[in-house]
């Protein structure tokens, strides 16, 4: 693992990179750990805002997962939180090896302006995205279906563009890997 705050600290590598981001406490660390079958590759926490740097993880010497700080509520000083925006924007807009961004959202919450602005920003910079709804196991099948539809409408996307995921049951894990594979092929 390597951590960075500015481009001169980024690892020198030609490996394709997939960045992971989302609101604080949406299950980003659990998603990454589940994808690589490791419980503690990325530290999980119930305290929002634990990820404060850009963290690079090389996976099987073939791909790099990049863990970005979460946006929204975080128990960190305002000065730290304000530095995340430029740090993340610099990474996303300048990294040649970046193949796409996984935007992680909690299925129990309708996305807000931050998620909508982030998706718009990704479109502006022509950065492909994968949209994941985590914590799907926390809802009944009926509520899952209703939230899936409501979130698709809120984001103005088709339901098929939203992958339902559960770190607990591993639901959606293969779909996430398939989507990552499609991004890397470009």
Model-derived regions, located:
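Conserved G1/Walker A P-loop phosphate-binding module
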Residues: 1-75, 185-186
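Short, glycine/charged-enriched secondary-structure capping and boundary segments
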Residues: 14-15, 35, 78-81, 116-120, ...
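Conserved nucleotide-binding/hydrolysis micro-motifs of P-loop NTPases
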Residues: 5, 50, 63, 70-72, ...
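Conserved C-terminal guanine-recognition region of P-loop GTPase G domains, centered on the G4
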Residues: 86-160
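Switch II of P-loop NTPase G domains
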Residues: 10-13, 47-55, 69-99, 107-121
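Structured catalytic cores of enzymes that bind and process phosphorylated ligands/cofactors
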Residues: 20-27, 32, 62, 100, ...
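Canonical P-loop GTPase G-domain recognition
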Residues: 1-7, 138-186
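Short aromatic/hydrophobic contact patches that present stacked aromatics
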Residues: 17-19, 104, 164
């Amino acid at each position: 693992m390597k951590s960075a705050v500015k481009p001169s600290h980024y690892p020198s590598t030609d490996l394709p990179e997939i960045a992971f981001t989302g609101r604080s406490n949406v299950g980003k660390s659990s998603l990454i750990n589940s994808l690589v079958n490791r419980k503690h590759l990325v530290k999980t926490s119930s305290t929002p805002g634990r990820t404060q740097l850009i963290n690079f993880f090389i996976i099987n010497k073939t791909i790099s997962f990049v863990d970005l700080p979460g946006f929204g509520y975080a128990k960190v000083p305002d000065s730290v939180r304000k530095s995340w925006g430029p740090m993340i924007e610099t990474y996303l807009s300048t990294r040649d090896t970046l193949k796409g961004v996984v935007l992680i959202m909690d299925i129990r919450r309708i996305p807000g302006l931050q998620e909508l602005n982030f998706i718009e920003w990704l479109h502006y910079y022509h950065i492909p995205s994968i949209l994941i709804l985590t914590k799907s196991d926390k809802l009944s099948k009926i509520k899952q279906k209703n939230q899936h539809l409501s979130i698709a409408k809120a984001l103005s996307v088709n339901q098929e563009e939203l992958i339902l995921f559960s770190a607990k049951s591993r639901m959606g894990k293969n779909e996430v890997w398939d989507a990552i594979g499609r991004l890397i092929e470009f």
